[in-house]
Design a protein with these regions (language model features):
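Surface-exposed short loop/turn segments
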Residues: 1, 65-114
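A structural "domain/chain start" motif
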Residues: 1-52, 154-156
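Extracytoplasmic
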Residues: 8-15, 26, 41, 57, ...
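Soluble periplasmic/extracytoplasmic beta-strand elements of cell-envelope proteins
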Residues: 12-18, 30, 85-89, 102-108, ...
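Residues that form or immediately flank small-molecule/cofactor binding pockets and catalytic motifs
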Residues: 20, 76, 126
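Structured segments of extracytoplasmic/periplasmic soluble domains
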Residues: 21, 57-68, 144, 148-156
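Short secondary-structure boundary motifs at beta->alpha junctions and helix caps
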Residues: 38-47, 114-148
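Mid-chain, structured segments of secreted extracytoplasmic proteins
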Residues: 40-70
Length: 156
């Protein structure tokens, strides 16, 4: 866990937040892939609890991509300091039992009261129609959604 004393003053702190549709049926088979637990019912597959687990998966990916930044969801860990706020809003993030998966929504970056950018994303993929195949497809959709999120210019 990151503490306020562990974050140098010159390190950028980015608060990551995820907004999602209300979670659906919780009585189903569960498959865990990456940091996200995917739950399957008769028609669709979701991540439950979606927001917290997807947020953790996104923070892990962002930290690997941008090691000069600290990514948090709870600002108390860094003395309520946030230089930027990265918001992911998912309108859809689901798969059906035939192996079709979709992620749709947008992400935005704010610095202070200013919106730096807002970018939509819409990705669709086909997967092996097994719980593991569908979970891997949903995981790849997270990577695709993250691909539209650029915190700094390339080559920096």
């Amino acid at each position: 866990m990151t503490t306020a004393g562990a974050v140098p003053e010159r390190t950028q702190v980015v608060r990551v937040a995820v907004s999602v549709p209300q979670a659906l049926d919780r009585r189903a088979l569960t498959v865990r892939v990456d940091a996200v637990r995917y739950t399957i019912d008769d028609r669709y597959q979701w991540s439950l609890p979606f927001g917290a687990e997807v947020e953790e998966a996104l923070r892990t990916r962002l930290a690997a991509r941008y090691p000069a930044y600290v990514f948090v969801s709870d600002l108390s860990a860094v003395a309520n300091r946030a230089d930027k706020r990265l918001q992911f809003v998912f309108d859809r993030y689901e798969a059906d039992q035939k192996g079709s998966a979709v992620a749709h929504g947008y992400c935005s970056l704010r610095a202070g009261n200013q919106t730096v950018w807002t970018r939509p994303f819409a990705f669709h993929t086909e997967a092996e129609a097994t719980p593991e195949g569908i979970a891997l497809a949903l995981q790849s959709l997270l990577d695709a959604a993250l691909s539209v999120c650029v915190l700094e210019p390339e080559g920096r």
